[in-house]
Amino acid sequence: MILPGALHISLVQAMVVPNVQVGAQNLSSHPAGAFTGEVAAEHLRDYGINWALIGHSQRRLLFGETQETCAEKVKLARA
């Protein structure tokens, strides 16, 4: 599995061999909508992305993400 930055997902998808999956480094804790700069789970699915890294220590430390935030992301990812 490769988890490129959001801007490079489609480029990496075009380069990987069939048995390598591409995922996202992050996804929004909000549904698709007017959340500037956020990448919604729904939008990732539109690009064939079925995996996202949720709960990474950097997101928790630098952005203050909590268990509740992570739970919301999981809920949206599974929807």
Residue ranges and their predicted role:
Residues 1-79:
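Active-site loop-to-helix "anion-binding N-cap" substructures in soluble metabolic enzymes
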